[in-house]
Amino acid sequence: METCNGLMRKNKRQKVSRNSDWSKLCPDVLRKIYETLRSPVDSHRAKIVCSNWYSVWKTCVKRPLCPLRIIHQGDSPTVGDGNRKLMGFSYNSYCMASSGNWLLMVDRCLKFYIYNLLTKERIDLPSMESKIRGGQVSFKSKSNNYNFGYLVGPSRKDDIVPYDYEAVEWKKSLAVLWVDETTGDYAVAWTFMRQYLFSYIKGDYSWCNLNHNGKSLVLFDMACENNKLYLLTMDHHIKIFNFYGDFLTGEQNLYPFNFVEDPSEYVWKRKIVIRRSGEVLIVLSLKKKVQNEEKLLFYIFKMNLESRKWERVYCIGDEMLIFGRGVTALALEDLDDGIKSNSIYFVGEDVWPDHQEHEHRVSNCGFFDIATSKIEWPKKIYCFINQNQWFVGGVAY
């Protein structure tokens, strides 16, 4: 039998256990825990434990900044060492774009949806085969073959554009996604064959055709941020669409981006990038011959509001630029595995494919140090979804 003193000690321990709240750890202890987490997934899971943990997370200076490489492997069960297999995706789905923790996915029959990589929430968008606002075009799929279809243009009989879901050209279509993590608002835009532009905003009943008067709109690139869609057109102008409820208003930059290449410079890609401040940048991926040697380079330009001319930018401060996403993110200090400020993150397809630099890389993702103009190819943890873009979890920006 337990003694009187033993019972008293047991009751005291039970009382202490009932009164202590394990989630209310000392803020200093929680900050130390957060600073040891390198993965955006682990950081996200920790911050949503309870309101107290989330409040402390917001005060952390060293929040994990860890861009992850996104690769699509279909239904393949094999994953290399150090790689992470993401569940919930099949061979039929393809990732078109990302924003924070969200991915823009498309299935056969042009079925679009957005998917939260961390919470697994899925939001289905209207079918592209349903009626499209702005009219004049429609999508049709071939019966009994969901890989093939066609777009019917304004002239109907003479304006039919076929597509193959598995074609490389199809998977290189421009697409952007913007999600406001606070309000839940979102906007999507994508181009069919880089000529027909469509958009969808939360609350719309259908997709909207942005090709006015049936004219094709050929683009170099586009970006979407804070309810604005930025287009870099083939005539080197920037066109901006503002999303306001059911209305779309457009404005055009009257000062085109005219970059004249030197005989030693060869541009591979042109990218429009929106900084955290809202400033618009244009980034060029190119190669340049220097003393009989070719170097892979990135040039950054911004508009001088006084001279109305585009000027080179040689520093982006404490930010890092995600080339595939067309945005910058805050990098408070240099982290391991090549994660550092004043750098441009890219994938193999973003630079010239015939360059000798590709022979020395240890992965298909790299970063360009703006200060030194040097490229490194760090070996990283990969997320298997899409082979041509970085995924940057929305945990620190």
UniProtKB/Swiss-Prot annotation:
<dbReference type="Pfam" id="PF03478">
    <property type="entry name" value="Beta-prop_KIB1-4"/>
</dbReference>
<feature type="domain" description="F-box">
    <location>
        <begin position="20"/>
        <end position="68"/>
    </location>
</feature>
<dbReference type="InterPro" id="IPR005174">
    <property type="entry name" value="KIB1-4_b-propeller"/>
</dbReference>
<protein>
    <recommendedName>
        <fullName>Putative F-box protein At2g04810</fullName>
    </recommendedName>
</protein>
<dbReference type="InterPro" id="IPR050942">
    <property type="entry name" value="F-box_BR-signaling"/>
</dbReference>
